[in-house]
Amino acid sequence: QECGPASFPIVSLISFLVGLILAFVGALQLSLFGAQMYLADLVGLGMTREMGALMVGIIMAGRTGSSYAAQIGTMNVNNEIDALKTMGFHPMEFIVMPRMMALIIVMPLLCLYADFMGMLGGAAVAIGLFDISTTEYWVRTELAVSFKDILVGVFKASIFGILIAYSGCIRGM
């Protein structure tokens, strides 16, 4: 219930800053070759393929994975898991699966949001420091980023969600 919406502020900040830094460092290198117009391509592809999913994965591992481990560990100490077994409930189905499903659903959504925030950070640098127009930046981004690139990042985020939920729940048990 708290794994998704409560993560938006930190995902927003981190992704915006990653896009900002990616654009700034990339623009400095691209300007050596007179290729600043490819700045939107760099940020768009970098965020959608790799950085968006990676940043969300790191944030959610630290935030949600540790929360899952602590919650389930507390349940274990209080013998709540033994009580579930006694009542005939399988702890994996009752405790682990809902948490895993939550992260499988939330991670791709957070990844898409992180991609957008990173591109927004890149746009801030491109428009503010390197005299690239807003229209030119977003048109170049649209031309560079394909649906396949977005799907690659979303798929990675889903896999990260499974791994984070599984490792957090298993550590708690």
Question: What spans do the regions from the language model cover?
Answer:
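Loop-to-helix entry region at the N-terminal start of transmembrane alpha-helices
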Residues: 2, 6, 10, 33-70, ...
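Hydrophobic alpha-helical transmembrane segments that constitute the membrane-spanning cores
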Residues: 14-21, 57, 61, 97-126, ...
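Short hydrophobic/aromatic-rich motifs at helix boundaries and adjacent loops
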Residues: 15-16, 51-55, 93, 139
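Membrane-interfacial helix-loop-helix connectors in multipass membrane proteins
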Residues: 21-48, 115-154, 158, 167-173
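Membrane-embedded alpha-helices of multi-pass transport/permease systems
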Residues: 62-72, 78, 121, 166-170
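Short cytoplasmic-facing helical segments at TM-TM junctions of multi-pass membrane proteins
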Residues: 71-97
